[in-house]
From Swiss-Prot:
Name of the protein described by the UniProt record: GTP cyclohydrolase 1
Coiled coil: none
Listed SUPFAM superfamilies: Tetrahydrobiopterin biosynthesis enzymes-like
Gene source species: Bifidobacterium longum (strain DJO10A)
Pathway where it operates: Cofactor biosynthesis; 7,8-dihydroneopterin triphosphate biosynthesis; 7,8-dihydroneopterin triphosphate from GTP: step 1/1
Subunit description: Homomer.
């Protein structure tokens, strides 16, 4: 089992809304702002509510998302393309966004509902993240919890930590991939990639 997935399953993660409010007030003071001024006085509450949503994946379980199957026997590729994703870079706590393409060869006992793939992307995107790990976690979860015989995941994202600060290259997109099981076969992988790239 993926070490990070395992640690998430074993830990009971909770969300401390008041702690987030206090941290935001301290942050505003630390950058030289007045958290009591008009325009900022409700900002700690707003950010605390937003963070509950942005980091909801910390309280979610991929096993729960992938537990149900439909009784359909197929050994062909199932691919859902262009799943929108929004996440937060764990290095700068700035957003990155883009799309995920998720394909799998189902387990013998059936296929998943297509929405399950989008929900799985959400579980891992809604937490402090790096794109490389996000891509791998989605692939590993499909093998671990859905019994997929083959998996391919490709993500394409723009990182605001690279667009609005630092090198400031707003047109740059990062592409990462993870391939597992039967989709490591060069011919099968090539077929999957041609479907992903076909716009």
């Amino acid at each position: 089992m993926n070490e990070y997935i395992e640690s998430c399953q074993q830990e009971k993660r909770t969300y401390d809304e008041e702690g987030v409010r206090e941290a935001v007030r301290l942050f505003l003071k630390s950058i030289g702002e007045d958290p009591g001024r008009e325009g900022l006085v409700e900002t700690p509450d707003r950010i605390a509510r937003a963070c509950r949503e942005l980091f909801a994946g910390l309280q979610a379980s991929p096993a729960d998302v992938l537990e149900k199957h439909f009784d359909v026997d197929t050994d062909e590729l199932v691919l859902v393309k262009d799943i929108e994703l929004y996440s937060v870079c764990e290095h700068h706590l700035l957003p990155f966004h883009g799309v995920a393409h998720v394909g799998y060869i189902p387990a013998k006992d059936g296929v998943m509902g297509l929405s399950k793939l989008a929900r799985l992307v959400e579980v891992y995107a809604r937490r402090p993240q790096v794109q490389e790990r996000l891509t791998q976690q989605i692939a590993d979860a499909l093998v671990e919890y859905a019994g997929a015989r083959g998996v391919i995941v490709v993500t394409e994202c723009e990182h605001l930590c690279m667009s609005m600060r630092g090198i400031k290259k707003s047109s740059a997109r990062t592409v990462t991939s993870a391939v597992r099981g039967l989709l490591r076969n060069p011919a099968t992988r090539a077929e999957a990639m041609s479907l992903i790239l076909d716009k």
